[in-house]
């Protein structure tokens, strides 16, 4: 795609446009509703950075919405599965959004700023604590927009999810305001990049940016005359950070983090690492027919927060104590199968379906991982399943704990 065409493509992320204009070698790929760099180095180099180093990558496919109005806390709490009112200032929580039948319509992360207290807060929670039992000391200042409540939504579900949420604003003093357009140089527009890997804290210390020792916490700093919002997200195998900033300053921050030792990676490696971590993506591993407990993502559910859309079904499942299938992380022995590949027991009985799969090329040898929806009755009989596609076949085994990836390059 020509540079001029890319610059006017609404799906192109700010980083994609910047790399194109700088003639940095890369390929583009559609990922989560945006055009973003697919590869920026050799696959093994990118995977090693994610697993053992500090990987720098695009998050321009994420979009933000501010929830405004005097009823914002009460209304939002009634629309999502996790706590809103009890969020500690400068923290966030991952949520599912349901319909009245309890089916998942999408997912989002709610972030609360630090400049106001929730008018609905019922059960005070302790301040987040660091790994040593003390309060996490975040350098910088609280982040907050006009309302103090913001949503992060992937581009591929943004329009649908916003339409769903807006349907339920009736007599409420609530407004959902999209905040970013991701166009380079456009006044007020913002974008995001990410840092993932066990050495991310070292990179941040090296360049003088805040390090957070707890997940789902954030702060804001002034850097090069710009406000940069730094959030630590959820990671199973490695810390994951987000940096939100004016898109006009993206090139400088990208280069600055590279001076600290961060290695640029593309979306193909990020996607493979997501699958290895066992973190589901909506529209891929979780779809509209699924119920929350079927996804086994209990970190998205809060059972004492009060009423919300779809709660009756969630509570009914909780009281019954079981669902008939679960999304499970898998390690594969064999070729990487396409999504939709059937999993079977030894006798040929269908046990489930692969929802996503990828190879993780490592210096110590390639590993294959997947996510799959497994029938509960099949899981009760076996933790390993067969699969076949074309002339290829293999075995898929449920991972009870996160995989150990070994050691990286010395």
Can you name each region flagged by the protein language model?
Residues 1-95, 103-105, 113-116, 122, ...:
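Acidic, proline/glycine-enriched N-terminal capping motif
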Residues 109-118, 140-280:
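Acidic, low-complexity central loop/insert segments
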Residues 71-106, 198-226:
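Internal amphipathic helical hairpin motif
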Residues 242-331:
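Anionic-ligand-binding alpha/beta catalytic cores of soluble enzymes and soluble regulatory domains
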Residues 71-76, 158-162, 201-204, 248-256, ...:
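Short, conserved charged micro-motifs
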Residues 57-78, 183-205, 322-332:
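Short glycine-/aliphatic-rich beta-strand segments at the starts of folded cytosolic domains
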Residues 69, 151, 195-197, 243, ...:
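Residue-level signal for inorganic ion chemistry
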Residues 3, 108, 289, 295-301, ...:
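Glycine-rich, small/acidic residue-mixed loop/short-helix segments
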């Amino acid at each position: 795609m020509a540079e001029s065409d890319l610059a006017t493509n609404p799906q192109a992320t700010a980083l994609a446009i910047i790399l194109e204009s700088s003639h940095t070698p890369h390929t583009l790929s559609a990922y989560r509703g945006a055009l973003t760099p697919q590869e920026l180095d050799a696959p093994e180099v990118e995977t090693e950075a994610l697993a053992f180093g500090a990987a720098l990558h695009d998050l321009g496919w994420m979009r933000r919405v501010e929830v405004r109005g005097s009823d914002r806390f009460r209304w939002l709490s009634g629309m999502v599965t996790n706590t809103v009112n009890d969020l500690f200032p400068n923290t966030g929580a991952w949520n599912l959004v349901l319909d009245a039948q309890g089916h998942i319509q999408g997912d989002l992360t709610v972030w609360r700023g630090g400049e106001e207290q929730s008018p609905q807060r019922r059960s005070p929670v302790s301040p987040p604590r660091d790994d040593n039992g003390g309060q996490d000391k975040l350098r910088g200042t609280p982040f907050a927009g006009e309302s103090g409540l913001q949503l992060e939504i992937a581009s591929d579900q943004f329009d649908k999810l916003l339409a769903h949420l807006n349907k339920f604003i009736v007599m409420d003093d609530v407004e959902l305001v999209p905040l970013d357009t991701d166009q380079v140089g456009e006044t007020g527009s913002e974008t995001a990049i990410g840092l993932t890997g066990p050495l991310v804290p070292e990179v941040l210390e090296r360049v003088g940016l805040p390090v957070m020792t707890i997940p789902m916490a954030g702060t804001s700093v002034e850097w090069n005359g710009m406000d940069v919002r730094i959030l630590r997200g959820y990671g199973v195998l490695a810390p994951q950070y987000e940096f939100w900033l004016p898109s006009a300053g993206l090139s400088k921050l990208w280069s600055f983090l590279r001076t600290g030792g961060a290695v640029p990676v593309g979306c193909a490696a990020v996607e493979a690492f997501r699958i290895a971590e066992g973190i589901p993506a909506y529209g891929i591993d979780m779809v509209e027919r699924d119920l929350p407990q079927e996804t086994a993502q209990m970190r998205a559910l809060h059972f004492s927060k009060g009423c919300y859309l779809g709660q009756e079904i969630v509570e009914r499942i909780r009281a019954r104590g079981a669902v008939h299938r679960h999304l499970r992380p898998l390690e594969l022995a064999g070729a990487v199968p396409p999504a939709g590949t059937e999993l079977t027991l030894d006798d040929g009985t269908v046990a489930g379906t692969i929802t996503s799969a990828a190879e993780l090329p490592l210096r110590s040898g390639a590993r294959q991982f997947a996510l799959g929806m497994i029938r509960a009755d099949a899981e009760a009989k076996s933790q390993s399943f067969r699969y076949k596609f074309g002339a290829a076949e293999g075995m898929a085994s449920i991972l009870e704990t996160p995989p150990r990836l070994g050691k990286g390059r010395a």
